[in-house]
Amino acid sequence: DGKFTVSNTATYRFGLFQEGKLPSQIVTRSYIYQDKDYTLPIISVVTDPINLYDDSLGVYVKGVNGRTGNGQSTPCNWNMDWDRPVNFEYITPEGGMVVNQEVDFAMCGGWSRAFTPHSFKLKAGKIYEGLNSIEYPFFADKPYLKHKTLQIRNGGNDTGCRIKDAAL
């Protein structure tokens, strides 16, 4: 009957395959198990783990194929201008999935590239489903509906802050 039960947070990728036929488009869905109330949107980024964590190809690790720079004296993969294919979902606090599309994932930032979690950007491109923008009003006070790139930042420029700094 094709039904299944989700009892914890999980991401699934579905596709249809039949010998002698072209495969279907892959469909990705993240299921957030509502064991608590969420007050912020949820960003789901799904890809083959090799794209992020492989020492040779991964953009999210120090790795072995990188370059120096951005405060690093040893080569780091996260310094490379590499794009990796990912599926991006934006889920509202109410549980509504308002964006679900394939995009490119790339590292961003300067010195903050070395700090985890790393900052990254999601870039729309016609190569994926013919969509060259991400369409959603992410910022209620801005008139923008279409975005070519979204940056997810780690607050790296604030890593040196201390409670005392704010109190002075």
Residue ranges and their predicted role:
Residues 1-168:
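Phosphate-handling architecture centered on phosphoinositide signaling
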